[in-house]
Amino acid sequence: ELRPGIYIIKDGPLKVDRGGSLLGENVGFYLTGDTSKLYFNTLSTVDLTAPKTGIMAGLLFFSNPKNATMTRTLGAKVLVRGHVIRSDDARRLVGTVYLPDDKLVIDGNSPVADKSEYTVIIAKAFQLNNGPNLVLQTDYDASDIPVPDGVGPMKESSVRLLH
């Protein structure tokens, strides 16, 4: 089990393979470098909550926006980096998953994040394969993990678009 804190993943994957587990309360992962990515394989266990305080309060995963995530092919931008969750036991992911220029693929047979008080996902592209069940809870008040500004519950003074 990880100790509370910030973990920097630089120039390589954060991989949890078959039979492996990644467990931690009050942990944040900062992904930096062109080859940093998440890969949670089948038969792995992932149970994480984001930090309560500090610079990454509420952020479970943060991908550095300066990472090279796209390449040009005949003038078009193509995503070259993707994060994959195939785990059959990634039931608790409390916090914000911030991958603004990356693709997130959920490709498992069991529910993902269904036991979380809340999960926010921010990604450039999002893909669900093989009938996975991604559950994005929004019970923000049930958690002491803060919700970063700009995501989560709307405040009365927030700007809203109405039809």
Residue spans for each PLM region:
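Low-complexity, S/T/G/P-rich flexible repeat/linker segments used as non-globular hinges
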Residues: 119-163
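Long, polar low-complexity repeats
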Residues: 1-135
